[in-house]
Amino acid sequence: ILGPDGARMSKSRGNVISPDPYVEKYGSDVLRLYLLFGFSYREGGPWDDNGIKAITKFYDRVERLSQKVISLHANKNDKIDAAEKDLLYTRNYTVRCMTRDIEDFSFNTATARLMEYLNALNKYDTADGEKNIKLFKECFSDFILLLAPFAPHFSEEIWEQLGNKKSVFLSSYPE
């Protein structure tokens, strides 16, 4: 990671960024997500405070959706129509691509896929018509399982709020 000026971080240049104030202000999970999303594992890049603010917005969107999902109660609607098929397609595509991205150390791409999956979950949530709540909760749970390696504390907290008894890290990776 380069300094904000684009030069290699160095005490002598005075462009070293300490993570401590960022952890204090945003939390370790937001900082971790920023580092994974903002920089290619192989290439790096310059530090940018706007990037961490963007990750904070993503984090907030996950939090808002999690509160909605937690408050939902199962319904008898178990239909799989076009909206459900779209959501399942996005879920399966995300799992497949993220698995490959993680194996290739393309963490920035894997994180971008999480953002796309969150967009699909929000789209399903705000669409007109009756929802398949069971499917929606399952897809959101899979999202949390995928998020867990990138934001472990946040994911564990949501996982427990979803009513799961064992740790998110003792749960099976989505297939």
Model regions and ranges:
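Helix-rich, typically C-terminal accessory recognition domains appended to large enzymatic cores
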Residues: P21-E175
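C-terminal, charged and often intrinsically disordered regions of DNA end-processing helicases
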Residues: S12-D20
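Primarily short, surface-exposed interaction patches in extracytoplasmic proteins
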Residues: L2-G3
